[in-house]
């Protein structure tokens, strides 16, 4: 129950209840009536709780029908309606499923929904970590650069979930700036639900996840360059200039970054950046 003596407060009391379960009753201020609107509630649920384990149901009013006397016409009654329960959220999260149970087209469809992109990603990396820390990451490499990639004021980062509850967009603390083209999610089981961007900047768990995710992206790109060189060439043409920023910023991963660099060469007699440092040394 709301505590009438404290604005925004509440009270808890024990009552005799015929049915099992807990009821939470919210009292809204007059100027906040929009939160009673069906579309507003559904929007909040799908944004923040679309992937939690339990289904969230809302009543959906459907107009009732009646048959007019001496007529075969079915009419919709304007005065009465029947309420049915409808599940609003998905109650599943793609990244929580075992990789062997996820189809390639499912990964691609999730990326398009996540990144608002019509093209399939070049590659992705899906990992679940258990041990001192427990978290799941699903990271994508886009096929092309967005038009505002060089806008340094635009916030970029991963979507952060904690125990499948959406916390924030553009959590930039989980990857360095030179990997700002990466799209994806990180879902932690250890971070507090009330975490803020300020706390993310000074959190040892976040630093550890950032280090692991950075290395994972660079290793995925290394594997892509080795196994699918034509795909890596496509990546380099889109994001190579940004990846070069890492050479000056990230000394810890300098060796990995050096292997990913590509340059032009008079040996090939064209202006394309396709030659690695290893290629130069091998000649």
Please tell me what each predicted stretch does.
Residues 1-283:
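Conserved GHKL (Bergerat-fold) ATPase module
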């Amino acid at each position: 129950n709301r505590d009438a003596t404290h604005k925004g407060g509440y009270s808890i009391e024990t009552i005799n209840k015929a049915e099992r379960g807990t009821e939470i009753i919210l009292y809204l201020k007059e100027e906040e009536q929009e939160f009673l609107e069906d579309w507003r509630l559904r929007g909040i649920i799908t944004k923040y709780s679309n992937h939690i384990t339990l289904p969230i149901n809302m009543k959906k009013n459907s107009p009732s029908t009646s048959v007019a006397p001496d007529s075969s016409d079915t009419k919709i009654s304007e005065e009465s309606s029947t309420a049915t329960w409808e599940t609003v959220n998905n109650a599943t999260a793609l990244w929580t499923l075992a990789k062997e149970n996820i189809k390639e087209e499912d990964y691609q469809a999730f990326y398009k929904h996540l990144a608002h992109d019509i093209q399939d990603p070049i590659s992705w990396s899906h990992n679940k970590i258990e041990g001192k820390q427990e978290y799941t990451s699903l990271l994508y490499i886009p096929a092309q650069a967005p038009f505002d990639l060089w806008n340094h004021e635009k916030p970029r980062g991963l979507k952060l979930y904690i125990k499948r509850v959406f916390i924030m967009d553009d959590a930039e603390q989980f990857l360095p700036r030179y990997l700002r083209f990466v799209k994806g999610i990180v879902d932690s089981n250890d971070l507090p639900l009330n975490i803020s961007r300020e706390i993310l900047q000074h959190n040892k768990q976040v630093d550890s996840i950032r280090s692991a995710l950075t290395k994972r992206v660079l290793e995925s790109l290394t594997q892509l360059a080795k196994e699918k060189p034509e795909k890596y060439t496509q990546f380099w043409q889109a994001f190579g200039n940004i990846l070069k920023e890492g050479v000056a910023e990230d000394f810890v991963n300098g060796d990995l970054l050096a292997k990913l660099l590509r340059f032009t060469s008079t040996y090939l007699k064209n202006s394309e950046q396709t030659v690695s440092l290893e290629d130069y040394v091998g000649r």
